[in-house]
Amino acid sequence: MEEFQGYLELDRYRQHDFLYPLLFREYIYALAHDHGLNKSILSENAGYGNKSSSIIVKRLITRMYQQNPLIFSANDSIQNPFFGHNKNLYSQIISEGFAVIVEIPFSLRLVSFLERKEIAKSKNLXSIHSIFPFLEDKFSHLDYVSDVLIPYHIHLEILVQTLRYWVKDASSLHLLRFFLHEYWNTLITPKKYITLFSKGNPRLFLFLYNSHICEYESIFLFLRNKSSHLRSTSSGIFFERIYFYVKIEHFVKVFFDNDFQCILWFFKDPFMHYVRYQGKSILASKDTPLLMNKWKYYLVNLWQYHFYAWFQPGRININQLCKYSLDFLGYRSSVRLNSSVVRSQMLENLFLINNAMKKFETIVPIIPLIGSLSKANFCNTLGHPISKPTRSDSSDSDIINRFLRICRNLSHYHSGSSKKKSLYRVKYILRLSCVKTLARKHKITIRTFFKKSGSEFLEEFLTEEEVVLSLIFPRTYSSSRRLYREQSWYLDITSINDLVNYE
């Protein structure tokens, strides 16, 4: 935000809500690419100078408003070699600049929200791992859960109408509408839907999707505010660019008759919880399945009549938590019963009391993770390590550091697993794949490589957590079990590794 504040004079734009002129500022496209103007995509691909991007954007916008914006004459291609490139580049130029602009009012409201709520450590709440302590605390007391896939077919006009709450500039909204209709086919995948969380997804569409989800989840916040007369704990919504997180405590009986074609009833449920991650959401409750069914049909009517997205009720399944596993964010989570026997003696009578307690467990699913490693050529489909092809000029230290970085990132992300057996197998695959890669480069056998490198090579693959724990605890059977079940959640993880994002 400090970078935006210096460039854009946000106080003035906040008063007038007029963002259209920012499309023709050079520094907008420098911010979009996160580096200087000398290395912008406009100068790299077209050979233009530092101050040519605004001219190109003006020409693209002019052609967009014409009847045939994608038809370029032969003279234009000769005089301007930029227009001879792929048409996808044109849409990329405008979309990246547009994304920076429309995020300005969104960021301003986010900052004001955090200041109003006096949230000092909002960065910790932005971590992906911050969801799991909440699940451990709440889900062990719940009975039923629904894993909902949020519809991805979103009408273009719905996206524009959603953005009207954030941007009040009519010129920007008109340009956005033209842009979406003209370049829709070049910005989406061949399957005609948005791949929302892929690496190559345009930044603008991520923002539009998050704004759309924000409006959907604001209805939950509205219900929580309407039930303020009930005894409830404070909760709120924390906005991010990609992930949204909200916790709902109480609901009260209300009904809508404006946006829906039927009356919907909501009953008080003090144990209803909601979590969204990427394009999916989880609803969990302690009450009977009847209440979960009511929420199921509420979601169906919400998407169909308010957002005009076709949604089948059969896509929402209600399951018992004790018999169901949740696969999300690279973990497989479930609620299991842990039995413990307590021996009690009163005078001459001996009693054995069997206590069953629910515990929320998170493990690493090994089969999908091996599939990701296989696609990245670290192993075959059966999990056997293989050597990776390397460049001839790559040094041994570069190859080792690359494998170490991948191994430590995976260990860091999966540190919350209650069982480390799957994680140890992944580390074994990466370590042996590194050895085979180096042996292939030097044209020697694996045994010869181990004789030259010694045991120091294996110690490099130990993570910092394992080194610290091995120094604190003596190497006994109890300490190894403690190391095997040690769980750690980190509040600095804001993105998912490509090998983990196999969903």
UniProtKB/Swiss-Prot annotation:
It is found in: Plastid, Chloroplast. The keyword rRNA-binding does not apply. Keywords: Chloroplast, mRNA processing, Plastid, RNA-binding, tRNA processing. Pfam families: Intron_maturas2, MatK_N. One of its GO terms (cellular component) is chloroplast. Transmembrane segments: none annotated. It comes from the Eukaryota. GO terms for molecular function: RNA binding. One of its GO terms (biological process) is RNA splicing. Disulfide bonds: none annotated. Usually encoded in the trnK tRNA gene intron. Probably assists in splicing its own and other chloroplast group II introns. Belongs to the intron maturase 2 family. MatK subfamily. This is Maturase K. The gene is matK.
